[in-house]
Amino acid sequence: MPKIKTNRGAAKRFKRTGSGGFKCVQSHRRHILTKKSTKRKRQLRSPDMVHPSDVRAVARMLPYT
């Protein structure tokens, strides 16, 4: 049986945690930052967890993590 291909886009965006979830970088921090408050930009720095309902789909895209 052939190997399953890893979705390369997903591999660059998600990392598996020790407890089996996935963490990802939050969006809205690339450009047009002048109108966003310092507090909002600081909070966007912290990693975000993938929602439990999406974990199965992400795990399917990353079979070897």
UniProtKB/Swiss-Prot annotation:
PROSITE patterns: RIBOSOMAL_L35. SUPFAM superfamilies: L35p-like. Coiled coil: none annotated. Residues 1-52 are annotated as: Disordered. The keyword Ribonucleoprotein applies. One of its GO terms (biological process) is translation. Keywords: Ribonucleoprotein, Ribosomal protein. Pfam families: Ribosomal_L35p. One of its GO terms (molecular function) is structural constituent of ribosome. InterPro entries: Ribosomal_bL35 (IPR001706), Ribosomal_bL35-like (IPR021137), Ribosomal_bL35_CS (IPR018265), Ribosomal_bL35_sf (IPR037229). Residues 26-44 have a biased composition (Basic residues). GO terms for cellular component: cytosolic large ribosomal subunit. HAMAP family: Ribosomal_bL35. NCBIfam families: rpmI_bact. Belongs to the bacterial ribosomal protein bL35 family. PANTHER family: 54S RIBOSOMAL PROTEIN BL35M (PTHR33343), LARGE RIBOSOMAL SUBUNIT PROTEIN BL35M (PTHR33343:SF1). This is Large ribosomal subunit protein bL35. It comes from Methylococcus capsulatus (strain ATCC 33009 / NCIMB 11132 / Bath).
